[in-house]
């Protein structure tokens, strides 16, 4: 992913550096996501187990949806139910399944834990304040995770506005402007009702957003909090997202204190 580009300059450099870890496996097992074609050519010294969405591999997976929009997975011909509409969560389940089954655990055991899993704080955790639905995805952010979080927000059914509150995506180096502009284009395409941005880099995001009824940039956290506290309405669905250094969880907690 594009996380930590500042230290590595390119996704290819990140791949090269992280891929080097496989050289130290010796007799270990490498679990490789074959949905990412860039990973298929990595040299691995130990055993290789492959998994991936829509990929020819040891644990091939497909995604379907239940009547309520929840994700259903077919992994190596096994049906796995989830209670989530979060595509990122589903992709993690595919990886976890490959590891769990090859280590000798049973599918039924895995299914039970998937259905009872609750995301930790800051990791697409769902909170409720009166009739408002909150997605707390404040732990960290890059372009890919922001896009996934917005898609997750848009998967929620029912009345109410779809709102995002975005803080800077940090550690992107020279790619920061481009990455933040791409996020703005995603916001434009997503049929959002409101976008609130904060942070120096988010100026690039805010500047390219088109067609969103409310598109507001803030350089003052207090002003943003005050506006949200006064303007949120019943049945709103609101996503908070930003890099660790932006401490977006503080904005969330202040809005709903």
Labelled PLM ranges:
Residues 215-224:
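Short acidic-hydrophobic, aromatic-tinged amphipathic segments that line or gate anion-handling sites
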Residues 95, 233-241:
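Short SAM/SAH-binding signature in class I
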């Amino acid at each position: 992913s594009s996380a930590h580009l500042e230290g590595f300059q390119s996704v290819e450099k990140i791949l090269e550096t992280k891929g080097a870890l496989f050289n130290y496996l010796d007799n270990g097992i490498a679990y490789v996501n074959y949905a990412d074609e860039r990973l298929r050519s990595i040299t691995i010294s130990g055993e290789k187990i492959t998994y991936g969405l829509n990929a020819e591999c040891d644990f091939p997976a497909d995604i379907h949806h239940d009547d309520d929009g929840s994700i259903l997975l077919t992994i190596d011909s096994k049906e796995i139910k989830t209670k989530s509409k979060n595509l990122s969560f589903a992709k993690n389940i595919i990886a976890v399944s490959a590891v769990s089954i090859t280590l000798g655990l049973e599918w039924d055991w895995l299914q039970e834990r998937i259905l009872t899993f609750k995301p930790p704080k800051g990791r697409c955790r769902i909170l409720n304040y009166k009739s408002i639905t909150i997605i707390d995805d404040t732990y960290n952010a890059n372009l890919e995770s922001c896009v996934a979080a917005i898609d997750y927000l848009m998967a929620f059914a029912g009345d109410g506005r779809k709102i995002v509150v975005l803080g800077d995506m940090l550690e992107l180096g020279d790619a920061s402007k481009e990455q933040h502009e791409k996020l703005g284009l995603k916001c434009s395409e997503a049929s959002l009702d409101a976008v609130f941005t904060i942070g120096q880099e988010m100026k690039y995001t805010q500047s390219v957003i088109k067609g969103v009824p409310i598109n507001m940039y803030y350089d003052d956290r207090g002003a943003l909090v005050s506006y949200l506290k006064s303007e949120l309405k019943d049945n709103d669905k609101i996503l908070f997202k930003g890099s660790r250094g932006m401490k977006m969880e503080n904005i969330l907690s202040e809005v709903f204190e």
